[in-house]
Amino acid sequence: MPNLKIAYSPKVEQYFSTNRELVEIAKTDFTDVAAIVLSSSDVGEYLDRIKATKFDVPVFIVQTDEQQVDPKFYDSIYHIQDLNGYDIKLYSRQIETAAKLYEEKMLPPFFKMLSEYVEMGNIAFDCPGHQGGQYYRKHPAGRFLYDFYGENIFRSDICNADVKLGDLLIHEGAACDAQKYAAQVFNADKTYFVLNGTSSSNKVALNAVLAPGDLVLFDRNNHKSNHHGALIQAGATPIYLETARNPFGFIGGIDSHCFEEDYLKSLIKEVAPEKLNQKRPFRLAVIQLGTYDGTIYNARQVVDKIGHLCDYILFDSAWVGYEQFIPMMKDCSPLLLELNENDPGILVTQSVHKQQAGFSQTSQIHKKDKHIKGQDRYVNHKRFNNAFMLHASTSPFYPLFATLDVNAKIQGSEAGRRLWHECVKVGIEARKLVLNHCELIRPFIPTTIKGKKWQDYDTEEIATNLEFFKFHPTDTWHKFEGYADEQYFVDPCKFLLTTPGISLETGEYEEFGVPATILANYLRENGIIPEKCDLNSILFLLTPAETITKMQTLVAQIALFEKHIKQDSLLKYVLPTVYKNNEDRYKGYTIRQLCQEMHDLYVSRNVKQLQKDLFRKATLPEYVLNPHDANIELIRNKVELVPLTDIVGRVAAEGALPYPPGVLCVVPGEKWSTTAHQYFLALEEGINTLPGFAPEIQGVYLQKDPDGRTRAYGYVLTDY
């Protein structure tokens, strides 16, 4: 159990006693205290600040003067005590009792049980073999590891051989209590904690619902894990929905026409005409609730448009999950929908580790389908959990599970909602800083709202009004096509910036450009790590961890980068690591010279158009056989590795994609298209001509030829 401190005003120290550590009221942020003791004269100075935290820390007031405490503060005060010296012990016991109750209330079920278990100091003869870190401490290398992480991470890495904490696979005890609490917080019927990322969460959900022959309505933006789970593992038949890319390289949403019933029926007629007249032809639709680049869907709109055609809808919310805790985003949350027996069942997967409070790999699945219980299409817990156990380890890492538990506690509190509101405001202030102090790099938001500059509005107004983030189809700033009004908005918690090279008026290439990968490398050289970049776009994730000083540091570095661009600094000073590793290639180069060559490569290959065409129906690769069957051919080695120069028209054995974002450009079983071929050859050319900026590519293999050139290869099926 934790032992939080008592915060106090120096004026009252003599009027209570405690074995706990004390901290002066002026020196705490209130996250480390279990009770607060103030003098009556301090009430006006501190009580509003304490109340604003929304932590509900019990506050004791010592009446140190004749002035009575104003009754308007009563709803924020736990106890008021006098100066009676005979009752100091009584008052001290009251303070300690309140502190203990606060600590009990603050600890969620699984983490509470885990911390109590560690305190028991059991003697371990079970897994894991390091047994509380004792093994590590017997070797110098192990001791380094032990000292680096600290004792508790090892003590809490325990085995399910002791049933005290409950079973994580069949959901018993404290583990079950934690998931029930999370379901309550997120407004789900059931919640499943997953310890191998949302890649596994998606596969669990998809394997629970889909089988060979099922039709799955498939967002072409879906992460590769959805292809793996729905198509390669489950063997379902996809009907793809085309999606948008803009010239900057941002990932957009599904075209509005794709949600029209007549259009969907035309696709069914092409792919599975035998299902055309079924009431619900789609066993499942898989939709990205929010894209990697912060295009957010309206879940109510999606369900109203296509819900009657689907047994279930899976909203892959890997890149969101916090929307219901930000009031202006609530309408986009599928978990807050009012549903009836005619609606689809709802599944939501969330990467808690991305922008919520979880260790890496923590994820969760929310199941909201009791409104269809009793219908044949309903997947009950036992069947769903069978899929869960297919993908879950029998040796779970309990600290991961504990962070999921604590995350729910944070999000379920008023304090958690306050933190998200502050996060949104910090992001708004950062955008204003860029708009007011940078000239080349621009935030990806509307230029004006009702004729007034975006940055001239009050931050609080922007933080509570979605109008400041909406994609209106007639607006030109975003350059997305195919959207309907009120369909999408920019996630305020994705700090999106564009770099020079694309005309803001036409969306066409300009004469000079600054590819975002150059800015990303510059920032990494200076200790700032962006989430990702692509073409002329760069993304930074915003969470309640952010502070305005952190954002000021980022903007200051961006402004310094712009200065280097304007004065055309030598590359060796701007990107010293890239220069050092490739000095023969870049000797004597300036930063603008590098920018120009990379920009010219994009222009010559028209990469922005290639990237857009990869996800448009007219230029999607031709579907030849089910991805499951293509994968079987790969396993049986009925494949050959061919250079990309010879790959057009051949059937892919593997999915091909750049990572990030992890969205397949070619799916197993599809013919390699001219568009995909040209796109990956453009990446190959960049790797060869501009060393130091190679992207990560999966499903395409880069090999050095005898002439020293790096060439791209891909596996294709031999019998097709």
Curated annotation (Swiss-Prot):
GO terms for molecular function: carboxy-lyase activity; ornithine decarboxylase activity; pyridoxal phosphate binding. Its EC number is 4.1.1.17. It comes from the Bacteria. Its cofactor is pyridoxal 5'-phosphate. The modification N6-(pyridoxal phosphate)lysine is found at residue 354. It catalyses: L-ornithine + H(+) = putrescine + CO2. The keyword Hydrolase does not apply. Keywords: Decarboxylase, Lyase, Pyridoxal phosphate. It comes from Haemophilus influenzae (strain ATCC 51907 / DSM 11121 / KW20 / Rd). The lineage of its organism: Bacteria, Pseudomonadati, Pseudomonadota, Gammaproteobacteria, Pasteurellales. InterPro entries: CheY-like_superfamily (IPR011006), ODC_inducible (IPR027568), OKR_de-COase_N (IPR005308), Orn/lys/arg_de-COase (IPR011193), Orn/Lys/Arg_deCO2ase_major_dom (IPR000310), Ornithine_deCO2ase_N (IPR027464), Prn/Lys/Arg_de-COase_C (IPR008286), Prn/Lys/Arg_de-COase_C_sf (IPR036633). Belongs to the Orn/Lys/Arg decarboxylase class-I family. GO terms for biological process: amino acid metabolic process. Pfam families: OKR_DC_1 (PF01276), OKR_DC_1_C (PF03711), OKR_DC_1_N (PF03709). This is Ornithine decarboxylase. GO terms for cellular component: cytosol.
